[in-house]
């Protein structure tokens, strides 16, 4: 039988062939309709296919026939006849009809089987649902049973717990009663005769039961003391009943506890000598019952070698201060303290290991140890290096002065703060080691601001004495100096020094560093910084003001020398050497004062820069502190500004006096009224002009260097105005002809070219007007009225110059001008 169809017997190609028999199994699994169809028709078509293959090459096969290889028909088909083209069509139709009939039958069979299966499934489903319902009812009943059982178990458990509690309470009461009986028995033993400890139980004398004895003794003493306290309260209330108390027991217990404590301490010391940490720990644990073990802790700390060995203290002093009799320096002390405090930290660290292994409360022991270290060992060395000096009679600067004490204080404070941090890292329990460290320096810090200000004052006085000594030494080595050459010697020897001001700032900066170190609160820091900075302002103000005053004294001496020269000239009419000496003194004093002004400006700039970089940031956190310091700085420097202003006025007077002297001595009457002798006119400036410009160029060189900004502009403007007035006054002493007018124009060009270097527009304008006015000496008389038509404001000055014309009277210029300028007549 082939795949898909089972044949019952042979069949032919006729229409009346036997029907196909299809099996339902053919439709199970991977069913293929193509395969079924091929199996049905393969027995009818092979002859047709062979004939087609023989009759026509290239026509190909009928599509789908080659693939029909599955299935066969019952019987063998007859050879194909050549009459009809497709003779098996009837057989195929009959075949298909039979197949359809069998397929219908098969479907009915399948439908029947499906109905039967549905009924069976429905029946089984009903049975299954009924079974599940019964199971659920059984589970619910089971849960209820478990709940009842759990409730009974809980009830039984609670009852058992209550019974256990009662049993435990009863056992505790029994134990307490037993202990109370024992305690009462022991208490009665202690309440015997005063001081009689011989009849005590063996417990209190057995060394192996010391811990138990100590615990019982402490309980008995607490009870006895409480009983005495209650009796005292009742007596105070008037309810006391006469009877014997427990005073004897308390006294005997105290004696026994003291004796036991001393015995344990002795055992503890012996174990400590042997480094027997186990025995030490046992003793410490028992001793902790006596006053919480305070005596044992203190005893252990007090017996440390660093607290009882005198050689340790001597070694500390040698390490920090060096050999006896030598003057210690802050740097050496800093190194010594660092080494000493490192040794102390290492020792405390080693002790911490022992304390942790021995004591039940190591933190409390460490607190006592660290406190003892700071209060005894550290305080001992601080007392040696910090001897507080007296402000009434401070040590001299040659021996270090107050500054040495302050530097030592700062070094000691820094190193001790570092020690406190190291000890905190090692461990010091609940001890506030930082606060304790601060307390070691409290007496020094309370008076620190006064010592700092006194030190700055002492340094300033020492510096001034040093400068005065140097000046006196130079003066003595120079010998006798003539008045003409020595007018400014004393001033130059004590000239303002920027280096000295830098020293002031350096001292103050060091003081501010210490102030920052000692002042933890912003308000305190701001107040101390302000006070210390005020010291600097006072020092700089006094120093530069005195320096400017000395430079002014030199200017005054030069002015006095000029006055003597003038008086001498009036009397003797000849003092050329004296005049030159006075001029040299004036020029020297001018330059000296300009140097003083320049150094004064540099000094002020240094102070202002120092304030901006170091002081202001410390004052800003406190309201008003920064503004107050700025105001103080302005007030302090105003004195120096006033001295500088007066000195600059004197400088102008000195320069004008010398210019006046040069003009008076060098200007000749013929300079502006040359005779008409046929010689060509001299177009060079006059000798007086040349001398004046050369003098001004030389002397003002120092002013250009020393002054700057608005100060320079104001000084040169004032000098230019004074020079213009002086020249006007000077020229009104002469008579001018046209050649002299040209000479005057040449002088004016020199003066104008020089004053342009002043950079003062108002001065330039005045000298330009002088050049216009000088034209009155050059133009013809008839051109004078039209000369100032565009400049009516200078007609008054021009009229005074016109009167200096040589032909003023001969040309009757007064009459002409009065008619043209009636307002000026």
From Swiss-Prot:
Its main location: cytoplasm. Keywords: Coiled coil, Cytoplasm, Exocytosis, Secreted, Transport. Disruption phenotype: No visible phenotype, due to the redundancy with SEC10b. GO terms for biological process: exocytosis. It holds the Pfam family Sec10_N. Expressed in seedlings, roots, leaves and flowers. InterPro entries: Sec10-like, Sec10_HB, Sec10_N. One of its GO terms (cellular component) is extracellular exosome. Residues 244-266 form a coiled coil. It is found in: Cytoplasm, Cytosol; Secreted, Extracellular exosome. Belongs to the SEC10 family. Component of the exocyst complex involved in the docking of exocytic vesicles with fusion sites on the plasma membrane during regulated or polarized secretion. Involved in polarized cell growth and organ morphogenesis. During cytokinesis, involved in cell plate initiation, cell plate maturation and formation of new primary cell wall. The exocyst complex is composed of SEC3, SEC5, SEC6, SEC8, SEC10, EXO70A1 and EXO84B. Interacts with EXO84B. Binds to EXO70E2. Binds directly to B1L. This is Exocyst complex component SEC10a. It comes from Arabidopsis thaliana. The lineage of its organism: Eukaryota, Viridiplantae, Streptophyta, Embryophyta, Tracheophyta.
């Amino acid at each position: 039988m082939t795949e898909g169809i089972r044949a019952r017997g042979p069949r032919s190609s006729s229409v009346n062939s036997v029907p196909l028999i299809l099996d339902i199994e053919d439709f199970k699994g991977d069913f293929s309709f193509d395969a079924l169809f091929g199996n049905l028709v393969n027995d009818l078509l092979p002859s047709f296919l062979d004939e087609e293959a023989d009759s026509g090459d290239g026509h190909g096969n009928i599509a789908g026939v080659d693939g029909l290889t599955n299935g066969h028909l019952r019987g063998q088909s007859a050879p194909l006849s050549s009459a009809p083209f497709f003779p098996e069509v009837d057989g195929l139709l009959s075949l298909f009809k039979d197949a359809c009939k069998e397929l219908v039958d098969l479907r009915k069979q399948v439908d029947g089987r499906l109905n039967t299966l549905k009924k069976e499934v429905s029946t089984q489903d009903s049975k299954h649902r009924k079974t599940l319902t019964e199971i659920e009812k059984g589970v619910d009943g089971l849960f209820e049973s478990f709940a009842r059982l759990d409730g009974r178990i809980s009830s039984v458990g609670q009852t058992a717990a209550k019974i256990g509690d009662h049993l435990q309470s009863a056992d505790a009461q029994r134990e307490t009663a037993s202990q109370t009986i024992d305690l009462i028995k022991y208490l009665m033993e202690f309440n015997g005769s005063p001081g009689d400890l011989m009849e005590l139980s063996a417990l209190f004398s057995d060394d192996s039961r010391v811990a138990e004895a100590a615990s019982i003794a402490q309980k008995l003493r607490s009870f006895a003391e409480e009983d005495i306290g209650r009796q005292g309260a009742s007596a105070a209330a008037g309810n006391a009943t006469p009877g014997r108390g427990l005073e004897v027991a308390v006294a005997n217990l105290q004696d026994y506890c003291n004796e036991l404590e001393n015995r344990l301490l002795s055992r503890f010391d012996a174990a400590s000598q042997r480094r027997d940490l186990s025995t030490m720990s046992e003793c410490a644990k028992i001793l902790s019952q006596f006053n919480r073990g305070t005596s044992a802790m203190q005893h252990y700390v007090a017996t440390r070698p660093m607290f009882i060995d005198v050689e340790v203290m001597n070694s500390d002093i040698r390490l920090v201060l060096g050999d006896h009799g030598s003057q210690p320096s802050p740097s050496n002390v800093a190194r010594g303290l660092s080494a000493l405090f490192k040794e102390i930290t290492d020792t405390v660290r080693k002790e911490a290991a022992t304390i942790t292994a021995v004591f039940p409360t190591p933190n409390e022991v460490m607190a006592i140890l660290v406190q003892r270290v700071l209060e005894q060992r550290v305080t001992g060395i601080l007392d040696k290096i910090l001897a507080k000096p007296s402000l009434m009679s401070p040590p001299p600067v040659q021996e270090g002065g107050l500054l040495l004490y302050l530097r030592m204080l700062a070094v000691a404070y820094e190193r001790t703060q570092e020690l406190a941090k190291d000890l905190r890292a090692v461990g010091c329990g609940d001890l506030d080691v930082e606060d304790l460290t601060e307390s070691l320096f409290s007496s020094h810090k309370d008076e620190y601001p006064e010592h700092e200000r006194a030190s700055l004052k002492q340094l300033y006085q020492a510096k001034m004495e040093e400068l005065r000594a140097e000046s006196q030494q130079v003066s003595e080595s120079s010998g006798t100096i003539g008045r003409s050459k020595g007018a400014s010697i004393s001033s130059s020897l004590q000239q303002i020094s920027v280096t000295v001001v830098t020293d002031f700032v350096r001292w103050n900066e060091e003081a501010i560093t210490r102030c920052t170190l000692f002042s933890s609160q912003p308000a305190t820091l701001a107040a101390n910084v302000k006070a210390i900075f005020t010291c600097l302002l006072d020092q700089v103000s006094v120093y530069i003001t005195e320096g400017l005053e000395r430079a002014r004294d030199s200017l005054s001496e030069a002015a006095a020398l000029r006055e003597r020269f003038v008086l001498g000239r009036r009397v003797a009419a000849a003092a050329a050497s004296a005049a030159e000496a006075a001029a040299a003194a004036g020029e020297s004093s001018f330059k000296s004062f300009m140097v003083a002004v320049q150094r004064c400006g540099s000094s002020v700039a240094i102070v202002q820069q120092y304030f901006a970089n170091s002081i202001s940031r410390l004052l800003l956190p406190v309201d008003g502190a920064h503004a107050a310091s700025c105001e103080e700085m302005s007030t302090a420097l105003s004195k120096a500004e006033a001295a500088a202003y007066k000195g600059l006025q004197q400088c102008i007077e000195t320069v004008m006096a010398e210019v006046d002297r040069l003009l008076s001595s060098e200007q000749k009457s013929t300079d502006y009224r040359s005779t008409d002798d046929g010689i060509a006119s001299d177009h060079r400036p006059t000798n007086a002009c040349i001398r004046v410009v050369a003098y001004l160029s030389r002397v003002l060189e120092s002013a250009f260097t020393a002054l700057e900004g608005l100060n320079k502009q104001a000084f040169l403007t004032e000098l230019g105005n004074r020079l213009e007035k002086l020249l006007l006054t000077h020229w009104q002493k002469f008579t001018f002809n046209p050649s002299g007018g040209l000479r005057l124009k040449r002088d004016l060009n020199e003066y104008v070219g020089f004053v342009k270097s002043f950079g003062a527009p108002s001065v330039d304008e005045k000298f330009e007007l002088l050049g216009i006015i000088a034209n009155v000496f050059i133009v013809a008389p008839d051109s004078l009225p039209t000369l100032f038509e565009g400049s009516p404001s200078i007609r008054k000055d021009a009229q005074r110059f016109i009167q200096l014309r040589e032909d003023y009277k001969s040309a009757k210029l007064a009459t002409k001008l009065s008619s043209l300028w009636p307002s000026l007549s």
